[in-house]
Amino acid sequence: MIALIQRVTRASVTVEDEVTGKIGPGLLVLLGVEKEDDEQKANRLCERVLGYRIFSDADGKMNLNVQQAGGSVLVVSQFTLAADTERGMRPSFSGGAAPDRAQALYEYFVERCRQQAINTQTGRFAADMQVELVNDGPVTFWLQV
């Protein structure tokens, strides 16, 4: 399971001209689900994402996680993160989980975030989405479990 996380001052996702998720300061999480992923990996990745200390403390040091910083989380499914890009000029998506399994794990990940008392907004699984964000820093990390 892969999460591309970006520290943002604001972010939103729109599906068919409807804003489905919108946050102020916090994390935009682009989430990719791979074939071998399961609930245990989703739990570990959620723990890492929410615990990752990439927000500044009073001394300006990256020392706070999203909850300590009072931030929110916007989770957007992105199957392209599971692409194999090592060869050729076209990505292969054979490493990605089947859509029904990927959706179940995506929803599980979102629910785990919400259980941690974090304001968690979402896109719409498998939809054509427009994601708008202001990357703060920029600060972007690739987390994989």
Curated annotation (Swiss-Prot):
An example of a Gene Ontology cellular component annotation for this protein is: cytoplasm
How would you classify this enzyme at the top EC level? hydrolase
Keyword Transmembrane helix attributed: no
In which broad location class does this protein mainly occur, judging by the first location in its UniProt entry? Answer: cytoplasm
Which CDD domains does this one have?
A: Dtyr_deacylase (cd00563)
Q: A biological process (GO) annotation for this entry?
A: D-amino acid catabolic process
Keyword Calcium in annotation = no
Q: How does it assemble?
A: Homodimer.
Protein task: An aminoacyl-tRNA editing enzyme that deacylates mischarged D-aminoacyl-tRNAs. Also deacylates mischarged glycyl-tRNA(Ala), protecting cells against glycine mischarging by AlaRS. Acts via tRNA-based rather than protein-based catalysis; rejects L-amino acids rather than detecting D-amino acids in the active site. By recycling D-aminoacyl-tRNA to D-amino acids and free tRNA molecules, this enzyme counteracts the toxicity associated with the formation of D-aminoacyl-tRNA entities in vivo and helps enforce protein L-homochirality.
Protein name in the entry: D-aminoacyl-tRNA deacylase
- The gene name on file is dtd
